[in-house]
């Protein structure tokens, strides 16, 4: 069993209700800092960790705790508790050599006057007549006797779901809010064959090139993502130049176009992952292989424009979404190191060495890339370059992934899929 999250923007509240959300998120922010202060000071003075139970007794009479609903306040204390536990776990890794001491920082306070999540556990969640009701403490209602209940429409698709947690998340300095429903997610029984394999090469214009031994190759189009990023970069630069002349770092307009860009990118990524997984289910593909190199974005140097296009596309989000869907439908998910898969010729069965920074591979490959997107094998056969790379990823991971198993469409132009 895993957990899934549905995130929705909170809309159609009154001005007073939005102000209530801001005040509650500020109280949560203040309480987090109070809890963290207690843990830090105890650590500095005693060189020990202040437990959650002890910290609770220190904070329960604090005005920020009293004004928040008890369950929400306790969850905020637990977040501070987990932050320091993570700090101690990293210190343990430093002792074993897995981490450097210089990279481990003690948890810092949140910005004064800022906003923090409202986290509701099961005992504070109330859903009735299609609406989620935000819990408000008695003390807060005494300060605001005329306030109305905050009712948020509850998604119909979650009517039968087992909620684990609900989070109210402030964004853009409290300009808007999202509500996140965390619920139990179960695997589905799917008829798949582990010998049916799909290999995927991630890219930019070709977001995902998919090659299978039971289906013709296809390419998930990434040019729409490039277009969205190109417009966002251009418009953001224009607005920032205006803002800087007025001594501002950001503006409401910059925030709006950034939110819109992020929503569009997230939509394309999720639809792409869903199309790929649906294709796997349709053809009973039981093994999904993704080409991946660690830090392949961090040290990339392919020119200013190409760097911008490549780095701003969230390929890690696509991999995570595919991994989650693979778990859901009992498909084996594999991440394969993909060095030299673009240079090696799949049709000629070239060797596939592994990249080593201290020892460069000096061998020669049978084929070569003669044009953008076109690869020529030793005997002159032309195939799509990304299809060649994707097939090599499958061959590098599975020794039985060979040309005889591939569909005849490998040598033809792969179909291009555009998600809308």
Where does each model-flagged region fall?
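Nucleic-acid substrate recognition interfaces
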Residues: 1-420
């Amino acid at each position: 069993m895993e957990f899934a999250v549905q995130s929705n923007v909170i809309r159609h509240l009154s001005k007073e209700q939005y102000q209530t959300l801001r005040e509650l998120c500020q109280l949560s922010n203040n309480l987090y800092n109070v809890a963290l202060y207690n843990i830090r000071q105890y650590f500095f003075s005693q060189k020990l960790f202040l437990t959650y139970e002890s910290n609770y007794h220190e904070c329960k009479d604090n005005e920020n705790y009293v004004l928040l609903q008890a369950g929400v306040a306790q969850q905020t204390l637990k977040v501070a508790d987990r932050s320091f536990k993570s700090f101690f776990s990293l210190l343990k890794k430093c002792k074993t050599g897995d981490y450097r001491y210089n990279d481990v920082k003690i948890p810092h306070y949140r910005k004064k006057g800022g906003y923090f999540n409202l986290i509701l556990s099961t005992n504070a969640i109330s859903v009735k007549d299609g609406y989620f009701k935000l819990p408000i403490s008695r003390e807060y209602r005494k300060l605001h006797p005329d306030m109305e209940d905050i009712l948020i429409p509850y998604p119909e698709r979650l009517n039968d779901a087992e909620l684990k947690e609900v989070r109210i998340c402030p964004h853009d300095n409290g300009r808007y809010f999202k509500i996140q429903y965390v619920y139990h997610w179960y695997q589905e029984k799917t008829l798949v064959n582990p010998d049916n394999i799909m290999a995927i090469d991630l890219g930019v214009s070709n977001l995902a090139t998919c090659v299978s031994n039971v289906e013709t190759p296809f390419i998930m189009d990434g040019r729409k993502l490039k277009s969205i990023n190109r417009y966002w970069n251009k418009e953001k630069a224009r607005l920032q130049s205006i803002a800087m002349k007025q001594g501002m770092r950001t503006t409401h307009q910059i925030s709006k176009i950034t939110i819109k860009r992020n929503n569009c990118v997230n939509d394309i990524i999720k639809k792409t992952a869903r199309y790929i997984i649906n294709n796997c289910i349709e053809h009973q593909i039981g093994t999904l292989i993704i080409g991946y190199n660690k830090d392949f974005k961090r040290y990339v140097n392919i020119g200013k424009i190409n760097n911008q296009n490549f780095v701003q596309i969230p390929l890690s989000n696509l991999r995570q979404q595919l991994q989650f869907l693979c778990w859901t439908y009992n498909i084996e998910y594999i991440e394969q190191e993909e060095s030299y898969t673009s240079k090696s010729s799949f049709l000629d069965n070239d060797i596939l060495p592994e990249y080593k920074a201290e020892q460069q591979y000096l061998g020669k490959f049978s084929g070569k890339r003669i044009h953008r997107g076109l690869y020529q094998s030793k005997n002159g056969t032309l195939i799509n370059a990304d299809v060649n790379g994707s097939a090599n990823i499958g061959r590098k991971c599975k020794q039985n992934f060979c040309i005889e198993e591939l569909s005849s469409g490998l040598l033809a132009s792969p179909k291009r899929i555009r998600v809308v």
